[in-house]
From Swiss-Prot:
EC number in record: 2.5.1.75
Entry binding sites for substrate: 11-16
This protein's name: tRNA dimethylallyltransferase
Provenance organism: Clostridium botulinum (strain Langeland / NCTC 10281 / Type F)
Recorded catalytic activity of this chain's protein: adenosine(37) in tRNA + dimethylallyl diphosphate = N(6)-dimethylallyladenosine(37) in tRNA + diphosphate
Length: 311
């Protein structure tokens, strides 16, 4: 059975540094579980790790697709499983590091995407239907077959509306029902999982998030978004809806001021961290590491290593 170490937690909690230190001590390689860092050219807004910051540790699933390309949890699972096997077969430890809980769950709950993978013709039909009759009409199709998705999704979120309709067409189940069934496969995985969640005092975390946004602005987030626009990437693309990118686009479009954009990025990032923590708390397999209780990252790393070896 493959040993799999997972380091997760909210944005800006310090997953990168901890995972690199662990990789150095455990002869590991890192697989990113971040839904924004998979996109090429989107470096500043995603807080993407630099080559220098990697400290020679190989990183996987970073800069995987172009910003206009489709990438979802099914794509992540397939690529992550390949990387895990490759790393393990070379005698190294695969370490998953990131904050996208759905990506992590797809591995440790062994989500099965074979039944409801793709129906390109149906997707094309729905997309054309949205053009002809409007997004509201396509959204209304959910009402009788998947009321939960109908209530939760907005008509403008066409990608997810189409996905929910697609899953129902292929499986006859709502997307939430399908996901819950997958989650029942809790232990049906080929991994010996050691799953750690990093956390810290909420006020300190929010301060770190605010500071990170200021650093992003100083590094040239506005210029990065301008460059992406010049390359033909548009606000309707999933990648450009990410926190930081959508707000800067609003600013560049004249809808809000720069100060408002910065405020919204900070607020959106803090709310995202809150949602991440809520998600991670639902998982009973994870061990929580309160960073405030340790004097240094080295202490945290040593504690994690000890718990892994004592398991």
């Amino acid at each position: 059975m493959i040993d799999l170490l997972i380091i997760a937690g909210p944005t800006a909690v310090g997953k990168t540094d901890i995972s690199i230190k662990l990789a150095e001590k455990l002869n590991g390689e890192i697989i990113s579980a971040d839904s924004m860092q998979i996109y090429k050219y989107m470096d500043i807004g995603s807080a993407k790790i630099t080559k220098d910051e990697m400290k020679g540790i190989p990183h996987h699933l970073i800069d995987v697709v172009e910003p206009h390309e489709e990438f979802n949890v099914s794509s992540f699972k397939a690529l992550a499983e390949e990387s895990i096997k490759d790393i393990w077969n070379r005698g190294k430890l695969p370490i998953i590091a990131g904050g996208t809980g759905l990506y992590i769950n797809s591995l440790i709950y062994n989500y099965d995407f074979t039944d409801a993978d793709r129906d390109e013709k149906y997707r094309e039909y729905l997309t054309k239907l949205a053009e002809d009759k409007g997004k509201e009409y396509v959204h209304s199709l959910l009402k009788d077959i998947d009321e939960e998705s109908y209530e939760k999704l907005y008509p403008n979120d066409l990608k997810r509306v189409v996905r929910a309709l697609e899953v129902y067409k292929i499986t006859g189940k709502s997307i939430s029902e399908y996901t819950k069934e997958n989650e029942k496969k809790l232990y049906d995985i080929p991994y010996n999982v050691n799953y750690f969640i990093l956390n810290m005092n909420r006020e300190v975390l929010y301060e770190r998030i605010n500071k990170r946004v200021d650093i992003m602005m100083g590094k040239g987030l506005i210029e990065e978004v301008k460059k992406l626009e010049s390359m033909g990437y548009t606000p309707d693309m999933q990648s450009m809806k990410g926190i930081g990118y959508k707000e800067v686009l609003f600013y560049l479009n004249g809808d809000i001021s720069l100060d408002e954009a910065i405020y919204l990025i900070k607020k959106g990032s803090r709310n995202y961290a809150k949602r991440q923590l809520t998600w991670f708390r639902k998982d009973k397999r994870s061990i929580w590491i309160d960073k405030d209780k340790y004097n240094s990252e080295e202490e945290i790393v040593d504690k994690i290593i000890k718990m892994v070896k004592d398991k």
